[in-house]
Amino acid sequence: MSRFEEQRQWGNLTRNLKRGVLALKENAVVQDGRVYDQNGVDKSHLAELSVKTTPAQREALQAVDELSTHELENGHFVFAFFESCKTMAERYPAFTQPDLARLMFIGTYTGYQTGRLQHDNGKVIDKRALETLIGISRNRFAEFYRKLIDADIVQEQGGEIHINPSVFFRGPLKESGYKLSEYSHTRMFRKTVRDLYAIYKGRKTAQLAIIYAVLPFLNFRTNVVCFNPQDSDDDLRAMNLDHLAALLGYKDTDKLRRALEGIVIDGEPVFWLPHNAKDRRQKRIVVNPRVVFAGPAESLGAVKVLFS
């Protein structure tokens, strides 16, 4: 109700009713969501309960709502774990870039708290179903699956496939059953990753591995790729494209740039490459929060606007 409407309705009240409302305001008792006057008479029809918040509290609540909406729009999330500033190539030396992209994809099918690979409707994804889901040849799948087993990423239990909670987990982290303090983690949004995997098939699959590869260097609040992602904002050292290329094993920086700029979801770039303000020959790297975002709710809007 607008302020003008409130004033109009107040002016239409009789003198006795106005006196009663003012008395109710001074002496009201709230019980079980109902409003009673000093005589115990229910006056809920004359009163409206509201929570009084400060501007800062209202902004925080709005930010939380925005994060919840963001999670819903992008298919909710799975926690992806990694060791900060340690490349995925170091953690999984046997994996090719397409392997890393496939690993990221199957992580989105991690069951809530169980770690079991399953569809959103609860249907179990066994080994044969996983081969179909990934969409590669039988021989290539057999090789990939063997790598998953050897790296202790998945285990078979009674025909079901369970994923290691130190790689992907859905649910409260205290329910994982693992000590995960040595790892960092981020929210990886399931629908976005699945949509990207459906778009970038065949030879293009390797491009998606870059998303997974940059996670250990991603600052949580800003989604900027950094040398020191865990430090405070004032101390962050953003990584240039040249450095990222060297880190990921690209001999040609321009090839990496084209790969990054070529990944798009619903018309939005997955990577934004702004120029370094102090040296326009250098480019920074920012990741679209529709794919991954680990920051607090109040930081989301500032990152999203870069991609809108």
Residue ranges and their predicted role:
Residues 1-22, 26, 112-163, 223-282:
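Winged helix-turn-helix DNA-binding recognition segment
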Residues 1-120, 158, 168-236:
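Short recognition helix of helix-turn-helix/winged-helix DNA-binding domains
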Residues 126, 159-181, 276-299:
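Short, cationic-aromatic polyanion-contact patches
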